[in-house]
Regions:
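Short N-terminal helix-initiation segments at or just after the protein's N-terminus
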Residues: 1-3, 73, 130-134
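N-terminal leader/targeting segments
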Residues: 1-52
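Extracellular/secretory pathway and lumenal proteins
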Residues: 12, 59-60, 115
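Exposed acidic/polar residues on beta-strands and adjacent loops within beta-sheet cores, strongest
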Residues: 29, 39, 47-53, 60, ...
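Long, charged/polar, surface-exposed segments that mediate recognition or autoinhibition
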Residues: 40-101
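A charged, solvent-exposed segment within the mature domains of Sec-exported extracytoplasmic proteins
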Residues: 78-137
Length: 137
């Protein structure tokens, strides 16, 4: 969870950096990097969620939704991402999601966070996920 809160909200995270600092079970893409000098990072796991241009997800063994929600809330607060907004209609919620929330990054950008459980390679796993939606018109 620490790796998620430390790195996943950074707009400067790249696929190479994600590979170096996130646990082995992570999923990352950034189709519209914050810095023009950074290369596009195509999806490393599941296909990109429709309507998003970035995902950072960490998964680990066990059921720890409550701790995951606390981790996400603390990371959002630390980054100053505090403006609540509605999860957009039609957003593709992950199977197993037990917590979902949306926050405004700026007037044109929204991030959606999800925490939940699902079957993993050795039993139940908990996932922490943040996806950045494509810019609003």
């Amino acid at each position: 969870m620490t790796a998620f809160s430390t790195h996943c909200f950074s707009p400067l995270l790249t696929a190479a950096r994600a590979e170096a600092v996130l646990p082995s079970r992570h999923d990352f893409y950034d189709l519209r990097p914050f810095r023009a000098a950074n290369d596009v990072s195509p999806p490393t796991g599941r296909a990109a969620t429709p309507g998003t241009d970035r995902r950072c997800e960490v998964a680990f063994d066990g059921e720890a939704v409550e701790a995951g929600v606390a981790t996400v809330a603390a990371a959002l607060a630390r980054e100053g991402i505090l403006t609540d907004t509605d999860v957009p209609d039609g957003f593709q919620r992950q199977e197993g999601t037990e917590f979902i929330a949306a926050r405004r990054l700026n007037p044109r950008r929204i991030a959606v966070v999800q925490v939940g459980t699902r079957p993993g390679p050795t039993g139940t796993e908990t996932f922490l996920n943040v996806e950045r939606l494509e810019p609003l018109p």
